Amino acid sequence: MTLLSFPSVTDADLNPSIDNTINTSTLMIAIVNMRFQANFQCVFIPLLILSIDGRLVPSQHEVNEPLTIDTLSAGNSLQVLNRQTRAPVANTTVCYPVVGCFDNNEPFNNAGLEVPQSPEFIDTAFLLFTQESQTDPEFIVYDSDKSILNSSVSTSRWLRIIIHGFQNNRESVWIPKLRAELLKLKNDEQSDVIVVDWGNGAKFPLYPNAVANIRLVGRQVGLLLKKLHDLKGISYDRMHCIGHSLGAHACGFTSNAVENQLARISGLDPAGPFFAGKKTIVRLDKDDAKFVDVIHSNTEIALGLGLGITEETGHIDFYPNGGQTQPGCPSIGALIGGVLGGQSEAAFEQTSCSHGRSHGYFIESINSECPYTAFPCHDHESFMNGKCLVCPISGCAQMGFYSIYSLGRGKMYLTTRSNSPFCGYHYFVELVLDRDMAKTSGEIYVAVYSNYELLANVSLTERSNADIKAGDILRHVFSYHTDLGKVDYVMIYFQKAKAIFGWGGQKGDEILVSRLRLKSLEDTVIYSGLCETTTKVAAYSTETLLLNRFDCDD
């Protein structure tokens, strides 16, 4: 995202008013169907009609027809979700007092040609929480010198700015949690917090309008920060913008308004729809602040599902669990099945689970002793197969609040747990099969025990009918919420795949294990078993291996 000069006003304010009568499932259908058409050109999708250049156009229904579920299902374009009066027009510029002008010329045509709604309509609120007033906020007027001069913002503390995304506002559950954790910080990290509430401009179902509105909201925040800098002497080097979804991109526009001088931007799963593949001028990127860290938790997956952006957008980009769906949230198959099966509202909520996990991770990282260690790697598969388990000279990184102190840069991978506390200590298990073993298929599990307590149960094959061959080396990375300490033994279980209609019945009924290693990635401790012997694990049975704290190869 780079700075852009705006032309003078040439068109009137185009502010839609619309009844909020569409439920969440309709938006999910609209977004998913739009992606189907853009990516797969599936002509059977009913809600959208795309023109040759890929821009949304009105359908056979008049744009000023009353908006109802019936008219949508009959074939209205997503553009109907934007305004009841008329479709947006190309080459439009709107200007407002204080914030200036905005046009929808390329590349700012990424919001379906929408331009920002007026400041009066969006009604952005700025709530200041300080160390002295942690629950009773001051309301600051962003364009009032008097309001800013009379505010209680400290000149010595960090100023953290929180910007929410679509269909959120200051009452959204995660915002008070994040604010509270930030206000607990001590010493050099001690902070004041400004919560930016632009909920009126982020309301369902007007997603394209919300995409356009973040340009105006970001500029408003930037103007506030400039006045705090000029009037109160607060350094840009002590300003940190934290944004979720659309709010992450709004942080980029905020920093643009102060010539990209912000110390830091933390993007929590920056929004993907209308931003993926677009020029950096319209979305968050690493040039927007001195340090930009990004957590990707719901990147685009099969059939266009996914609310977050896939591209690297920061100095460090974290992809926990691969960045697509998160443990404890529905799988890719469940999401696709929900949409194709007509359960689109459930699918939207399921997708939101992974999308929202990004702020869950960030909130937890602020005051947790668990390090959220992440490793540089080319892709998630390579990481899970144990190919990126050593921190290079350039360094690993710590996902979340403390990433700014990490040496590592670029793409980082880690695993998390399925429920809170999400952070876990990483362990790598490697199982080597004997070269004289008969070929078979099924699933192999390893259960890890300490003091006779089960700590983790890991599938090394990740599916029930995996081919298992002589000499295979099976590897897997998993996490546990505390340091395991001393590991006593593991139990290996082999579940052979069942024959189907006579197929698969000739395969071996056992596996032969010649080596097992368990490595702690945070402290590099290695446990080994079977250095010089082989053990047999019959189908549907378990074998116990005692572990020693050394590497068989040493």
Regions found by a protein language model. Give the residues of each.
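Classical eukaryotic N-terminal signal peptides for Sec-dependent ER targeting/secretion
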Residues: 1-2, 16-46
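Flexible, membrane-associating and regulatory peripheral segments of lipid-active enzymes
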Residues: 33-195, 202-213, 223-236, 283-286, ...
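Alpha/beta-hydrolase active-site loop signature
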Residues: 200-202, 272
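Glycine-rich nucleophile elbow surrounding the catalytic serine of serine-hydrolase chemistry
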Residues: 242-253
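Conserved hydrolase catalytic core segment
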Residues: 257-262
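The feature captures the conserved acid-bearing segment of alpha/beta-hydrolase catalytic domains
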Residues: 263, 269-326
